[in-house]
Swiss-Prot record:
The gene is phnC. Residues 2-246 form the ABC transporter domain. It is found in: Cell membrane. It is an enzyme of class 7 (translocase). This is Phosphonates import ATP-binding protein PhnC. Its EC number is 7.3.2.2. One of its GO terms (cellular component) is plasma membrane.
Length: 257
Protein backbone atom coordinates (compact mmCIF):
# COMPACT_ATOMS: atom_id res chain seq x y z
CA UNK A 1 0.00 0.00 0.00
CA UNK A 2 1.05 3.57 -0.74
CA UNK A 3 -0.06 6.12 1.83
CA UNK A 4 0.19 9.91 1.72
CA UNK A 5 -0.01 11.43 5.19
CA UNK A 6 -0.79 15.15 5.17
CA UNK A 7 1.58 15.69 2.24
CA UNK A 8 2.26 19.22 1.01
CA UNK A 9 4.70 20.62 -1.53
CA UNK A 10 5.56 24.31 -1.72
CA UNK A 11 7.90 25.50 -4.47
CA UNK A 12 10.58 28.15 -3.82
CA UNK A 13 8.40 30.84 -5.44
CA UNK A 14 5.64 30.09 -2.93
CA UNK A 15 3.41 28.13 -5.29
CA UNK A 16 1.62 25.23 -3.62
CA UNK A 17 2.06 22.08 -5.69
CA UNK A 18 0.27 19.86 -3.18
CA UNK A 19 -1.91 20.93 -0.27
CA UNK A 20 -2.37 18.52 2.65
CA UNK A 21 -2.87 15.32 0.65
CA UNK A 22 -4.18 12.30 2.54
CA UNK A 23 -4.51 9.27 0.32
CA UNK A 24 -4.21 5.48 0.38
CA UNK A 25 -3.61 3.38 -2.74
CA UNK A 26 -3.98 -0.35 -2.26
CA UNK A 27 -1.68 -2.98 -3.76
CA UNK A 28 -2.72 -3.98 -7.28
CA UNK A 29 -4.92 -0.97 -8.03
CA UNK A 30 -4.91 0.73 -11.44
CA UNK A 31 -5.37 4.37 -10.50
CA UNK A 32 -5.72 7.18 -13.03
CA UNK A 33 -5.14 10.75 -11.88
CA UNK A 34 -6.83 13.52 -13.87
CA UNK A 35 -6.85 17.29 -13.75
CA UNK A 36 -5.77 20.39 -15.62
CA UNK A 37 -2.11 21.11 -16.27
CA UNK A 38 -0.64 22.45 -13.04
CA UNK A 39 -3.24 20.69 -10.88
CA UNK A 40 -0.52 18.70 -9.08
CA UNK A 41 -0.70 15.34 -10.87
CA UNK A 42 2.98 15.09 -11.79
CA UNK A 43 4.08 16.48 -8.43
CA UNK A 44 2.01 13.87 -6.60
CA UNK A 45 3.22 11.05 -8.82
CA UNK A 46 6.89 12.01 -8.67
CA UNK A 47 6.83 12.47 -4.92
CA UNK A 48 6.24 8.72 -4.51
CA UNK A 49 9.83 7.89 -5.47
CA UNK A 50 11.18 11.28 -4.36
CA UNK A 51 11.92 12.71 -7.77
CA UNK A 52 10.12 15.64 -6.13
CA UNK A 53 10.80 16.16 -2.44
CA UNK A 54 7.79 17.08 -0.34
CA UNK A 55 7.74 20.05 2.04
CA UNK A 56 5.52 18.55 4.72
CA UNK A 57 4.07 15.18 5.67
CA UNK A 58 5.16 11.63 4.97
CA UNK A 59 4.79 9.01 2.24
CA UNK A 60 4.67 5.37 3.28
CA UNK A 61 5.19 2.34 1.03
CA UNK A 62 4.21 -1.02 2.50
CA UNK A 63 4.43 0.49 5.97
CA UNK A 64 7.92 1.96 5.44
CA UNK A 65 8.62 5.68 5.11
CA UNK A 66 10.29 6.55 1.82
CA UNK A 67 10.31 10.16 3.03
CA UNK A 68 12.74 9.25 5.82
CA UNK A 69 14.74 6.69 3.81
CA UNK A 70 18.42 7.39 3.05
CA UNK A 71 21.34 5.75 1.29
CA UNK A 72 20.95 2.03 0.69
CA UNK A 73 17.47 2.03 2.17
CA UNK A 74 16.27 4.65 -0.31
CA UNK A 75 17.92 2.85 -3.24
CA UNK A 76 16.24 -0.41 -2.19
CA UNK A 77 12.83 1.23 -2.06
CA UNK A 78 13.32 2.98 -5.39
CA UNK A 79 14.29 -0.34 -6.95
CA UNK A 80 10.69 -1.45 -6.44
CA UNK A 81 9.30 1.59 -8.29
CA UNK A 82 9.31 1.73 -12.10
CA UNK A 83 8.93 5.13 -13.75
CA UNK A 84 7.51 5.79 -17.21
CA UNK A 85 7.82 9.31 -18.63
CA UNK A 86 6.08 11.16 -21.46
CA UNK A 87 9.49 11.65 -23.10
CA UNK A 88 10.35 7.90 -22.77
CA UNK A 89 13.66 8.63 -20.96
CA UNK A 90 15.71 6.17 -23.01
CA UNK A 91 19.37 6.30 -24.00
CA UNK A 92 18.73 7.00 -27.65
CA UNK A 93 22.04 5.72 -29.03
CA UNK A 94 21.95 2.49 -27.06
CA UNK A 95 20.16 -0.66 -28.14
CA UNK A 96 16.70 -1.50 -26.94
CA UNK A 97 18.14 -4.44 -24.98
CA UNK A 98 20.62 -2.23 -23.12
CA UNK A 99 17.85 0.21 -22.25
CA UNK A 100 15.76 -2.61 -20.79
CA UNK A 101 18.75 -3.94 -18.85
CA UNK A 102 19.00 -0.52 -17.21
CA UNK A 103 16.12 -1.74 -15.09
CA UNK A 104 18.52 -4.21 -13.45
CA UNK A 105 21.07 -1.58 -12.40
CA UNK A 106 19.71 -1.36 -8.86
CA UNK A 107 20.46 -5.04 -8.27
CA UNK A 108 24.19 -4.92 -9.01
CA UNK A 109 27.38 -3.04 -8.19
CA UNK A 110 28.14 0.20 -9.99
CA UNK A 111 31.28 -1.31 -11.59
CA UNK A 112 29.42 -4.25 -13.13
CA UNK A 113 26.68 -2.10 -14.60
CA UNK A 114 29.13 0.54 -15.85
CA UNK A 115 30.95 -2.19 -17.75
CA UNK A 116 27.67 -3.58 -19.01
CA UNK A 117 28.16 -6.92 -17.27
CA UNK A 118 24.83 -8.59 -16.51
CA UNK A 119 24.23 -12.23 -15.53
CA UNK A 120 22.43 -14.62 -17.87
CA UNK A 121 19.30 -14.44 -15.73
CA UNK A 122 19.07 -10.68 -16.32
CA UNK A 123 19.36 -11.14 -20.08
CA UNK A 124 16.60 -13.75 -20.03
CA UNK A 125 14.40 -11.43 -17.99
CA UNK A 126 15.05 -8.55 -20.41
CA UNK A 127 14.09 -10.69 -23.41
CA UNK A 128 10.95 -11.92 -21.63
CA UNK A 129 10.00 -8.33 -20.83
CA UNK A 130 10.41 -7.27 -24.46
CA UNK A 131 8.33 -10.23 -25.58
CA UNK A 132 5.66 -9.26 -23.09
CA UNK A 133 5.14 -5.90 -24.84
CA UNK A 134 5.49 -7.39 -28.35
CA UNK A 135 8.74 -5.70 -29.27
CA UNK A 136 11.27 -8.55 -28.96
CA UNK A 137 12.30 -8.26 -32.62
CA UNK A 138 13.68 -4.77 -31.88
CA UNK A 139 16.06 -5.94 -29.13
CA UNK A 140 19.22 -5.03 -31.04
CA UNK A 141 17.90 -1.90 -32.75
CA UNK A 142 18.94 1.52 -31.51
CA UNK A 143 16.30 3.22 -29.41
CA UNK A 144 16.26 6.29 -31.67
CA UNK A 145 15.25 4.09 -34.63
CA UNK A 146 11.93 3.28 -32.98
CA UNK A 147 8.60 5.07 -33.20
CA UNK A 148 7.26 6.91 -30.17
CA UNK A 149 4.92 4.09 -29.30
CA UNK A 150 7.68 1.51 -29.58
CA UNK A 151 9.95 3.60 -27.36
CA UNK A 152 7.24 3.82 -24.72
CA UNK A 153 6.85 0.05 -24.80
CA UNK A 154 10.59 -0.24 -24.21
CA UNK A 155 10.06 1.91 -21.11
CA UNK A 156 7.39 -0.52 -19.93
CA UNK A 157 9.70 -3.47 -20.61
CA UNK A 158 12.40 -1.75 -18.54
CA UNK A 159 9.98 -1.49 -15.58
CA UNK A 160 9.13 -5.18 -16.00
CA UNK A 161 12.80 -6.15 -16.07
CA UNK A 162 13.25 -4.05 -12.95
CA UNK A 163 10.65 -6.33 -11.30
CA UNK A 164 8.92 -3.22 -10.05
CA UNK A 165 6.11 -3.60 -7.54
CA UNK A 166 4.80 -0.13 -8.40
CA UNK A 167 4.64 1.54 -11.82
CA UNK A 168 4.30 5.33 -12.03
CA UNK A 169 3.38 6.56 -15.53
CA UNK A 170 3.51 10.34 -15.97
CA UNK A 171 1.48 11.29 -19.07
CA UNK A 172 2.72 8.16 -20.91
CA UNK A 173 0.54 8.67 -24.01
CA UNK A 174 0.50 12.47 -24.30
CA UNK A 175 2.62 12.47 -27.47
CA UNK A 176 1.15 9.33 -29.09
CA UNK A 177 -1.54 8.80 -31.74
CA UNK A 178 -4.84 7.10 -30.77
CA UNK A 179 -3.90 3.60 -31.98
CA UNK A 180 -0.52 3.65 -30.23
CA UNK A 181 -2.14 5.13 -27.13
CA UNK A 182 -4.44 2.12 -26.95
CA UNK A 183 -1.53 -0.31 -27.37
CA UNK A 184 0.51 1.31 -24.59
CA UNK A 185 -2.40 1.52 -22.14
CA UNK A 186 -3.46 -2.03 -22.99
CA UNK A 187 0.06 -3.17 -22.10
CA UNK A 188 0.01 -1.31 -18.79
CA UNK A 189 -3.44 -2.64 -17.92
CA UNK A 190 -2.56 -6.25 -18.75
CA UNK A 191 0.65 -6.08 -16.72
CA UNK A 192 -1.34 -4.65 -13.81
CA UNK A 193 -3.86 -7.48 -14.02
CA UNK A 194 -1.40 -10.33 -14.65
CA UNK A 195 1.26 -9.38 -12.10
CA UNK A 196 -0.71 -7.35 -9.57
CA UNK A 197 1.64 -4.39 -10.00
CA UNK A 198 0.21 -1.25 -8.44
CA UNK A 199 -0.11 1.22 -11.32
CA UNK A 200 -0.67 4.97 -11.12
CA UNK A 201 -1.13 6.83 -14.40
CA UNK A 202 -1.53 10.55 -15.09
CA UNK A 203 -3.85 11.26 -18.02
CA UNK A 204 -5.60 14.28 -19.52
CA UNK A 205 -8.23 12.27 -21.39
CA UNK A 206 -11.46 11.67 -19.48
CA UNK A 207 -12.47 8.95 -21.93
CA UNK A 208 -9.24 7.01 -21.37
CA UNK A 209 -9.51 7.40 -17.61
CA UNK A 210 -12.97 5.84 -17.68
CA UNK A 211 -11.83 3.06 -19.98
CA UNK A 212 -8.76 1.87 -18.06
CA UNK A 213 -8.98 2.92 -14.42
CA UNK A 214 -10.35 0.94 -11.52
CA UNK A 215 -10.23 4.16 -9.52
CA UNK A 216 -10.04 7.80 -10.57
CA UNK A 217 -8.49 10.60 -8.53
CA UNK A 218 -9.16 14.18 -9.58
CA UNK A 219 -6.84 17.01 -8.59
CA UNK A 220 -7.43 20.74 -8.71
CA UNK A 221 -4.97 23.37 -7.44
CA UNK A 222 -2.95 20.78 -5.52
CA UNK A 223 -5.92 19.26 -3.73
CA UNK A 224 -7.89 16.04 -4.23
CA UNK A 225 -11.40 17.04 -5.30
CA UNK A 226 -12.57 13.58 -6.39
CA UNK A 227 -11.62 10.05 -5.39
CA UNK A 228 -13.86 7.21 -6.46
CA UNK A 229 -14.66 4.27 -8.70
CA UNK A 230 -15.07 4.72 -12.45
CA UNK A 231 -18.86 4.48 -12.28
CA UNK A 232 -18.89 7.33 -9.76
CA UNK A 233 -16.96 9.63 -12.13
CA UNK A 234 -19.94 11.35 -13.72
CA UNK A 235 -19.79 14.27 -16.14
CA UNK A 236 -20.77 16.51 -13.23
CA UNK A 237 -17.82 15.26 -11.18
CA UNK A 238 -15.45 15.93 -14.06
CA UNK A 239 -16.89 19.43 -14.37
CA UNK A 240 -15.88 20.00 -10.75
CA UNK A 241 -12.39 18.64 -11.38
CA UNK A 242 -11.80 20.77 -14.46
CA UNK A 243 -13.42 23.90 -13.13
CA UNK A 244 -16.40 24.42 -15.45
CA UNK A 245 -18.69 22.56 -17.81
CA UNK A 246 -17.25 24.19 -20.93
CA UNK A 247 -13.74 22.98 -20.11
CA UNK A 248 -15.05 19.50 -19.34
CA UNK A 249 -16.99 19.32 -22.63
CA UNK A 250 -13.94 20.41 -24.60
CA UNK A 251 -11.84 17.68 -23.02
CA UNK A 252 -14.51 15.07 -23.74
CA UNK A 253 -14.49 16.04 -27.42
CA UNK A 254 -10.69 15.83 -27.58
CA UNK A 255 -10.73 12.43 -25.88
CA UNK A 256 -13.07 10.95 -28.49
CA UNK A 257 -11.06 12.15 -31.51
Amino acid sequence: MIEFRNVSKVYPNGTKGLNHINLKIQKGEFVVMVGLSGAGKSTLLRSVNRLHEITEGEIMIEGESITAAKGKGLRRMRRDIGMIFQSFNLVKRSTVLKNVLAGRVGYHSTLRTTLGIFPKEDLELAFQSLKRVNILEKAYARADELSGGQQQRVSIARALAQEAKIILADEPVASLDPLTTKQVLDDLKKINEDFGITTIVNLHSIDLARQYATRIIGLHAGEIVFDGLVEEATDEKFAEIYGDVAQKSELLEVAVK
